[in-house]
């Protein structure tokens, strides 16, 4: 699964993603519920692309029909939409006060708030369905010809949402959780996982910097339909105390929920890998 696709999906959720019915209303109106539903598709596509790449480069063999069905079942189980929503809901409920929730809901009930939520939901779908080369190309093109005013607004948005840091934490957590899960299922030492994790941590600043640099282009692409005046009002909300607290709470909730799902996926996928390896050894012995 590519870092670019995860970055786009995670950032779309954080842009506007918290007790009982009010939290449910918040997640529904913000589009967060709809965006979380895309994660299962995102993971399945990423894993299948990774396997296809391994086969093409002769580093591995393709999955059988039975193994592919098992993979889909594991992804569906680990990244179950209702479970992810439940974890995010619980986390937001602990972090946001009723006053925080009321303030965000008031924003979401404005014409601009509804417009932003619709854009975010649509963009989350695009990050899953659009071929990556096409998506990267469109994001790159979106950066061209922007006015200084537009660039300044997009930089403020990226800074307020801490895009680089939030996405880097999520990506590092996902990769580490999956690797740990796979290795624990294969009864292997976690020393290799720790080594890889340290390598990712060492590159964290560079990864975050690269993502911050790309924030202008990515948000230019995502919010290209917004006029400068509307974009500025959106940025002003995100930069407000309520907006900052909400985006931080959403990023943390998503990171936690996705990490748990990734760890579970890694363990189950490891079991499939172990069975596959044993099957191959059995056939070789004949």
Please report, for each region that a protein language model flagged, where it lies by residue.
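An acidic-aromatic pocket/loop used at catalytic or ligand-binding sites
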Residues: 20, 24-37, 42, 133-174, ...
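Hydrophobic h-region of N-terminal signal peptides that target proteins for export
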Residues: 8-19
């Amino acid at each position: 699964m590519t870092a670019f696709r995860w970055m786009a999906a995670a950032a779309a959720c954080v842009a506007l993603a918290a007790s009982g019915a009010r939290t449910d209303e918040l997640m529904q109106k913000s589009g967060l519920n709809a965006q979380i539903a895309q994660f299962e598709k995102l993971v399945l596509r990423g894993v299948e692309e990774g396997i296809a790449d391994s086969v093409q480069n002769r580093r591995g063999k393709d999955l059988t029909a039975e193994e592919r069905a098992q993979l889909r079942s594991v992804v569906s189980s680990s990244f179950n939409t209702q479970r992810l929503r439940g974890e995010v809901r619980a986390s937001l409920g602990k972090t946001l006060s009723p006053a925080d929730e009321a303030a965000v809901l008031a924003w979401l009930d404005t014409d601009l708030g509804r417009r932003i939520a619709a854009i975010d939901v649509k963009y989350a779908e695009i990050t899953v369905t659009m071929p990556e080369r096409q998506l990267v190309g469109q994001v790159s093109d979106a950066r061209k010809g922007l006015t200084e005013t537009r660039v300044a607004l997009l930089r403020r948005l990226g800074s307020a949402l801490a895009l680089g840091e939030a996405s880097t934490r999520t990506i590092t957590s996902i990769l580490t959780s999956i690797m740990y899960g796979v290795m624990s299922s294969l009864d292997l030492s976690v020393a290799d996982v720790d080594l890889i994790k340290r390598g990712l941590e060492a590159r964290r600043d560079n990864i975050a910097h690269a993502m911050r640099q790309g924030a202008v282009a990515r948000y230019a692409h995502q919010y290209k339909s917004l006029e400068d005046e509307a974009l500025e009002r959106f940025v002003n909300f995100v930069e407000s105390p309520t907006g900052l607290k909400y985006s931080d709470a959403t990023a943390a909730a998503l990171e936690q929920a996705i990490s748990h799902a990734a760890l579970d996926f890694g363990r189950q996928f490891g079991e499939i890998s172990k069975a596959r390896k044993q099957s191959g050894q059995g056939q070789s012995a004949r």
